[in-house]
Amino acid sequence: MQVLSFSSPKLSTRNMVYMAMLMAMQIVLGRFSFGTPWLKISPAFFATILMGYYFGPWLAAGAAALNDQLSIMIFSPGANFPGFTISAAIAAMLYGMFFHGKKVTVLRTLLAVGMVLLISNIILTTLWLNIMGTPWQGIIWPRTIKNVVMLPIQTALSYGTLKAIERIRPHL
C-alpha cells in the first residue's frame, strides 16, 4: 500500500474549471487573514487542502504558485518575493501527496497539517522573512507557538471538511 500519492488527474476542461474555482476561493479566503505581516492567521488553507485532495501534488503545487502570483499582482502594494510562492507550492504539494486518492483519516490529516505547518510555515516562511531583513531570533518562537496552537485547530477543521467532501464527492 502506497502511503503518499505522487499522481495527478488528467487536466480536462472540467478539472480546470474546478481548479479555477478553488483558486478564486483561496484568493477570497486569503483576504480574511489577520495578524502582523510575520504572524498571520488565514482560512485560505481550506482551498489549498481541497486543491491537493482533488488534483494531487503536481497540479495543486502549480495552481498554488500561480495563485500566489495572481494575489500579489492584484492585492500587494509591495515587492514580490519568490520564497513565499515556493512555500505556497510546497504546502499544496504536501497536501496533494497526503490526500489525493487516499482515504481521509485523523492520523493522515494530522501528519499532513503538521508537515505543512513545520516545513512551509515555520521553517521556510521564517527563512524568507529572515532573508527579507526580519531577524529570525525575534520571530521563530512566536511563529512556532502560533503553529503549535493552530495544529489541532487546523487538523480538526481539515478533517471535518475532507470527510464532508468525501461523502459528496461521488455525487459531483
Curated annotation (Swiss-Prot):
<dbReference type="GO" id="GO:0005886">
    <property type="term" value="C:plasma membrane"/>
</dbReference>
<feature type="transmembrane region" description="Helical">
    <location>
        <begin position="44"/>
        <end position="64"/>
    </location>
</feature>
<feature type="transmembrane region" description="Helical">
    <location>
        <begin position="19"/>
        <end position="39"/>
    </location>
</feature>
<comment type="function">
    <text>Folate-binding protein that interacts with the energy-coupling factor (ECF) ABC-transporter complex. Unlike classic ABC transporters this ECF transporter provides the energy necessary to transport a number of different substrates. The substrates themselves are bound by transmembrane, not extracytoplasmic soluble proteins. Binds folic acid with a dissociation constant of 9 nM; binds polyglutamyl folates less well. Upon coexpression with its energy-coupling factor (ECF) ABC-transporter complex EcfA1A2T in Lactococcus lactis subsp.</text>
</comment>
<keyword id="KW-1003">Cell membrane</keyword>
<dbReference type="InterPro" id="IPR024529">
    <property type="entry name" value="ECF_trnsprt_substrate-spec"/>
</dbReference>
<protein>
    <recommendedName>
        <fullName>Folate transporter FolT</fullName>
    </recommendedName>
</protein>
<dbReference type="Pfam" id="PF12822">
    <property type="entry name" value="ECF_trnsprt"/>
</dbReference>
<feature type="transmembrane region" description="Helical">
    <location>
        <begin position="109"/>
        <end position="129"/>
    </location>
</feature>
<keyword id="KW-1133">Transmembrane helix</keyword>
<keyword id="KW-0290">Folate-binding</keyword>
<dbReference type="GO" id="GO:0005542">
    <property type="term" value="F:folic acid binding"/>
</dbReference>
<dbReference type="GO" id="GO:0022857">
    <property type="term" value="F:transmembrane transporter activity"/>
</dbReference>
<comment type="subunit">
    <text>In Lactococcus lactis subsp. cremoris (strain NZ9000) forms a stable energy-coupling factor (ECF) transporter complex composed of a membrane-embedded substrate-binding protein (S component), two ATP-binding proteins (A components) and a transmembrane protein (T component).</text>
</comment>
<feature type="transmembrane region" description="Helical">
    <location>
        <begin position="81"/>
        <end position="101"/>
    </location>
</feature>
<keyword id="KW-0813">Transport</keyword>
<dbReference type="InterPro" id="IPR030949">
    <property type="entry name" value="ECF_S_folate_fam"/>
</dbReference>
<keyword id="KW-0812">Transmembrane</keyword>
<keyword id="KW-0472">Membrane</keyword>
